[in-house]
């Protein structure tokens, strides 16, 4: 063996040696990143048990910084290691091949690939990147689903469904006891039985026959104030009903608050407007494989994103984008997205896609006065915030490539006119230097055009709730026009226009001063001083000026939003550290 190593060293070139060191440095950085990420995650249960909800938010913000911080650290180390070879494409291609062999069969090989891509991109400033230097599109870089048996435990129903449910709950290890375990188990058993009866007849029949089994994931899913137990009820023929059990830690002890059943209900929990979960696992890709079984309509990038691996989610999304575009009819073209054209963003989409692409315009329409840098800061603010189910998550891409032939002539003309500085056309490719990707929704101002009175009342109720949920999370949307809100397939209202978003506590909410005389009232100029952060809630009514029915429906539930006192009270609560309860499931699903 020593002779073999000696021979290899003697036969190595400088390029071989440097490429090997580059690969080792990136791999060491990846391992350090993953360890730090996991260490923060490991504290989730303790924070839940101690009801340290402010620390929960701090830990989430800290974890969001880990990846970029480690990429920066590795990039600096690599510059020292490589120096003369830093800009040599051949050295990097060799380093990629060596790195690929190093992480081959590694438990987290796909995420390790993404970390290499990120490091290379940080050093090469993205624009010089070629796919030969990246782990992206080739089939060998796409891992196939792997067994997840080591992640789950199964409980037989042979002793009865109620007994199995009690075993399921008592198998969970917490420092805090349940305040009323027997009542929780009885309610959970009855709710799951009824859910199976409605959603999966085969599972329901086997529950009654004490046949089949319950399967659950060993690792809990922590987010905000709750812990979620994920699993499914399975019949022997393979029919199954996924579930997610929400556990809260109340002053009296632990309490089962709700259970979500079926893939559709679980999708609400894993929605794109929610904060990321903390899941105690060193096998995230296998957890994504398992979650894909429970929610087969969810894409892999959505699930990686949900458990906090947001950079790898971008890699998975890019693959998804390329595949779906390639497999769609050639007649499907990128076009301007439905809705009112943005003053700050050019937004486009393609038929069959669930996403929109948003590019910051070169010049903003009046009265917008922000800069590109300020808009980017707003989007970063949202990334760090607790989105409380009311802010759409975004993926930020640099130098994202598209097939030029898939763009409509009309959209191409708009792009050249409004985002020319962000646009590169090279051969058959259209490349965007900077772009945000968001989930596509129906703009609220368009949604209400097709509503009957019942649907209008419901969506206006949720519109106000969305604004109040954001206020409770110390977030003020800024521009609250209906065109800046979207409606999900569940009829839930979320906000997606971030160029004026800010912390609620940065605002100065005021009532409009009374005029002193008729001249002031008739004057076209303001008769009182206004500071840049002054907000006048009484003027929010103008948002409904074109739709009296919508205003009446909104006002019947949320007239308090037009008063400065409401907002001032919210600010006081935020400053006092109050964190409102926001549930990622319907109130009707909560246990009584």
Curated annotation (Swiss-Prot):
Binding site for ATP: 337-343, 358
Localization: Cytoplasm
Pfam families linked: AceK_kinase, AceK_regulatory
Keywords on record: ATP-binding, Cytoplasm, Glyoxylate bypass, Hydrolase, Kinase, Nucleotide-binding, Protein phosphatase, Serine/threonine-protein kinase, Transferase, Tricarboxylic acid cycle
First and last residue of the signal peptide: none
A GO molecular-function annotation: protein serine/threonine kinase activity
Main location: cytoplasm
Keyword Methyltransferase attached: no
BP GO annotations: glucose metabolic process; glyoxylate cycle; tricarboxylic acid cycle
The keyword tRNA-binding belongs to this UniProt entry's keyword annotation: no
E.C. numbers: 2.7.11.5, 3.1.3.-
Residue numbers annotated as active site: 393
Catalytic activity: L-seryl-[isocitrate dehydrogenase] + ATP = O-phospho-L-seryl-[isocitrate dehydrogenase] + ADP + H(+)
GO cellular component term, pick one: cytoplasm
HAMAP family xref list: AceK
NCBIfam families per the UniProt record, alphabetical: PRK02946.1
Family according to the record: Belongs to the AceK family.
UniProt function note: Bifunctional enzyme which can phosphorylate or dephosphorylate isocitrate dehydrogenase (IDH) on a specific serine residue. This is a regulatory mechanism which enables bacteria to bypass the Krebs cycle via the glyoxylate shunt in response to the source of carbon. When bacteria are grown on glucose, IDH is fully active and unphosphorylated, but when grown on acetate or ethanol, the activity of IDH declines drastically concomitant with its phosphorylation.
Protein name: Isocitrate dehydrogenase kinase/phosphatase 1
High-level lineage: Bacteria, Pseudomonadati, Pseudomonadota, Gammaproteobacteria, Alteromonadales
């Amino acid at each position: 063996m020593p002779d073999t190593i000696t021979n290899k060293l003697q036969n190595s070139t400088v390029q071989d040696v440097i490429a090997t060191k580059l690969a080792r440095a990136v791999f060491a950085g990846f391992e350090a990143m993953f360890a730090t990420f996991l260490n923060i995650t490991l504290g989730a249960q303790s924070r839940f048990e101690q009801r340290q909800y402010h620390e929960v938010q701090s830990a989430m913000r800290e974890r969001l910084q880990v990846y970029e911080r480690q990429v920066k650290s590795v990039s600096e180390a690599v510059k020292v290691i490589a120096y003369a070879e830093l800009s040599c494409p051949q050295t990097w291609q060799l380093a990629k091949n060596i790195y690929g062999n190093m992480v081959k069969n590694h438990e987290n090989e796909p995420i390790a690939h993404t970390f290499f891509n990120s490091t290379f991109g940080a050093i090469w400033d993205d624009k010089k990147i070629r796919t030969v230097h990246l782990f992206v599109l080739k089939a060998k870089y796409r891992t196939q689903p792997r067994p997840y048996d080591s992640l789950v435990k199964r409980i037989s129903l042979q002793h009865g469904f109620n007994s199995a449910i009690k075993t399921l709950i008592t198998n969970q290890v917490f420092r805090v006891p349940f305040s009323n375990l027997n009542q929780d188990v009885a309610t959970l058993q009855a709710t799951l039985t009824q859910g199976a009866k409605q959603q999966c007849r085969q599972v329901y029949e086997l529950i009654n026959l004490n046949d089949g089994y319950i399967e659950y994931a060993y690792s809990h899913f922590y987010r905000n104030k709750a812990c979620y137990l994920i699993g499914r009820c399975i019949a022997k023929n393979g029919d199954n009903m996924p579930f997610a059990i929400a556990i809260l830690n109340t002053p009296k002890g632990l309490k089962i608050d709700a259970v979500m059943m079926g893939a559709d209900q679980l999708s609400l929990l894993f929605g794109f407007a929610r904060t990321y979960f903390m899941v105690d696992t060193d096998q995230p890709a296998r957890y994504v494989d398992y979650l894909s079984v429970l929610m087969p309509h969810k894409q892999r990038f959505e699930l990686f994103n949900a458990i906090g691996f947001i950079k790898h989610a971008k890699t998975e999304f890019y693959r998804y984008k390329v595949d779906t575009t390639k497999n769609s009819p050639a007649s499907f073209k990128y076009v301007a997205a439905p809705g009112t054209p943005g003053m700050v963003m050019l937004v486009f989409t393609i038929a069959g896609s669930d996403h929109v692409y948003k590019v910051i315009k070169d010049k903003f329409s009046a009265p917008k006065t922000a800069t590109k840098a300020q808009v980017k800061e707003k989007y970063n603010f949202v990334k760090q915030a607790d989105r409380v189910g009311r802010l759409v998550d975004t993926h930020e891409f640099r130098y994202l490539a598209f097939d030029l032939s898939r763009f409509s002539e009309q959209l191409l003309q708009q792009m050249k006119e409004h985002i020319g500085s962000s646009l590169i056309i090279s051969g058959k490719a259209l490349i965007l230097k900077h772009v945000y990707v968001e989930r596509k929704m129906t703009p609220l101002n368009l949604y209400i055009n097709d509503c009957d009175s019942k649907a209008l009342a419901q969506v206006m109720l949720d519109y106000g709730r969305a604004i109040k949920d954001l206020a409770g999370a110390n977030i003020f949307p800024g521009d609250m026009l209906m065109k800046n809100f979207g409606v999900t397939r569940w009829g839930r209202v979320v906000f997606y226009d971030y160029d004026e978003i800010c912390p609620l506590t940065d605002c100065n909410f005021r009532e409009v001063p009374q005029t002193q005389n008729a001249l002031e009232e008739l004057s076209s100029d303001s008769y009182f001083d206004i500071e840049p952060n002054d907000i006048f809630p009484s003027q929010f009514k103008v948002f409904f000026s074109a739709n009296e029915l919508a205003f009446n429906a909104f006002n019947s539930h949320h007239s308090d939003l037009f008063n400065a006192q409401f907002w001032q009270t919210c600010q006081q609560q935020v400053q006092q550290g109050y964190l409102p309860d926001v549930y990622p499931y319907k109130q009707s699903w909560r246990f009584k």
